[in-house]
């Protein structure tokens, strides 16, 4: 303090040091799907054929236009991002344009943003002097949601800018991509991940995070709950861990929005209108999803050993009608009552 009053500066001994411990900045928590996203194509789970072809393309430094399709959560986006990192290294951000479902991808965006990026000419070396492919990469995630006009505009850009740009389209349904684009791309189908590989990957992530999953049964439930989607399963496990402090079977049902099996069976076994009215009122008060109930009910009806074929047919027919109405914006209350009445009739007339 004396030194400060005389010179206006703190001396080396006067600097605030708290307890002499260096302050360490804590990293903010990151989503597990990003934190453990594969860094190289060899880290991609259960897509051996795709990885082999990509490895050969990368070894020659040449990449064709690509079309990745398959179920969600199978590694399509991770594969192309890993390939881009291996191709471009430290300049990946400058060489890659990624557009996904959150971006506007109408015809105007294709004509302006994508076309402008594709027309840029790039060098064949990095700032550090290492060789680099002389082209850029445009990644269009969920390309099957693009309009036909936007896809037609993209086709023209793909034709004209092949020398300086490669395109990778990612979609769930290849049938929604126009033929002129599919004919210009090398198509790769990402198959559903094997159950044991998904569980193994979930186990690795949980061990890395220090999360106790007991005998692993909860991981099997996570795979069943998320229908084999590795991304959804990882997100569900992280949500359960962050919200509840531990991963449990009931916690997974809660964070994924599933309807408890007890409620599904209760709805399927209603015998009169009074029971139905009480169930629907409590179901909606608890804020469960009617669409989710109908989806789970469909699987239960088909596999049920207590219902006759006649009962299954009548319930399934009404279930399909009510599901369609919900998709069209119908009221959940009305559809639950309508289907419930059909279930009552079926239960009372086996």
Residue ranges of predicted features:
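P-loop/Walker A NTP-binding region and its immediately flanking N-terminal helices
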Residues: 1-183, 187, 319, 323, ...
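Conserved small helical "lid"/interfacial subdomain of P-loop NTPases
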Residues: 185, 191-217
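Conserved GTPase G-domain signal focused on the G5
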Residues: 106-108, 228-231
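Helix-rich C-terminal "collar"/helical-bundle subdomain used as an assembly and partner-interaction module
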Residues: 2-17, 265-350
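Short conserved motifs of the RecA-like P-loop NTPase core
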Residues: 135, 201, 212-225, 247-253, ...
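C-terminal helical "lid" of AAA+/P-loop NTPase domains
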Residues: 217-225, 231-245, 264-268, 278-282, ...
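Amphipathic alpha-helical repeat elements characteristic of tetratricopeptide repeat
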Residues: 35, 179, 196, 216, ...
